[in-house]
Amino acid sequence: VAVVTDGTAVLGLGDIGPEAGMPVMEGKCALFKAFGDVDAVPICVRSKEVDDIVKTVSLIAGSFGGINLEDISAPRCFEIEEKLKETCDIPIFHDDQHGTAVITLAGVINALKLVGKKLDEVKIVTSGAGAAGIAIIKLLMSMGLKNVIMTDRKGAIYEGREGLNPIKEEMAKITNFNKEKGTLAEVIKGADIFIGVSAPGTLTQDMVRTMAKDPIIFACANPVPEIFPDEAKAAGAAVVSTGRSDYPNQVNNVLCFPGLFRGVLDARASDVNDEMKVAAAYAIAGLVSDEELTAEYILPAAFDPRVKDAVAKAVAEAARSEEHTSELQSPWHRVLRGVGVKKK
């Protein structure tokens, strides 16, 4: 697997460039090997141009079984991923988007089970409309979420709001159907779930108090969350999850990407679709039994040895059931199997 970056959105550091991003990519490759037994190679591209990155990756794609896009700033990351999916016949996966979405879905599944609510009946408000925030909502909506309001620095995102980039305009058309306007503090009233992928201190205790009964908080900004767990619980939160390892319920992408790529490679998949992501999320959520499920334990630990095999198996089965495998689609595998090869 190639781990590709341009160094424009490195976690906690921002736009530091490809050279400075190299150690982070090397660390990612080490995690691939340690947690998924997947060999990975860091590729740091010295360009911020979408077409440059797409061309570079396309030209080397034949050397890899999959591409993991990493730490590329929004909205360019969406365009790069989309174009690579069109030009490459191997899986393209932007972990900052989809890995985070998978883990969040797994956490939401178990948190809702704990408080006795259903996804298609709850109201979710998010803070942050970048790569992770948008991917999370898209995946949750594919599972039946209906009532969701996304917010950014300027407040609620709704159709017709001025100054939205094309990606936010797209999201405005499928979210916030009542066109609620205002700040996060105004639109979060009555919400069942808050999902933050934004900035430290965005969510206050007063906001939590205005949410519905047994509110669920995903405060995933790193290294400082939107609200700290003790503050959220003091304000009435039933379940709190963060991106930090020193608190329970860590949303950690290492629960997803190693096992997901292991399953993708095992199935010789040519794509990563929503069905495969959902399968990964349910596999992760299922590692916490009903007997074990508590407000302090909705997600397995990053070092849980069961994670890789559970995720890999679920993803591979989903890939095969959807026939998104290169054995069926890749020209190289068709040649090997003699499919479509004219015999003399």
Regions found by a protein language model. Give the residues of each.
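Glycine/serine-rich phosphate-binding loop and adjoining beta1-alpha1 elements at the start
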Residues: 2-122, 312
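Glycine-rich phosphate/diphosphate-binding loop of Rossmann-like nucleotide-binding domains
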Residues: 11, 18-33, 94, 98, ...
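Adenosine-phosphate binding glycine-rich loop
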Residues: 95-96, 115, 219-323
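Single conserved hydrophobic/aromatic residue that forms the stacking wall/gate
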Residues: 323-344
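Rossmann-like adenosine-cofactor binding region
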Residues: 169-238, 244-246
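General beta-strand structural signal in soluble alpha/beta enzymes
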Residues: 42, 68-71, 92-95, 126, ...
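Short, structured coil segments at secondary-structure junctions
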Residues: 36, 87-88, 144, 213, ...
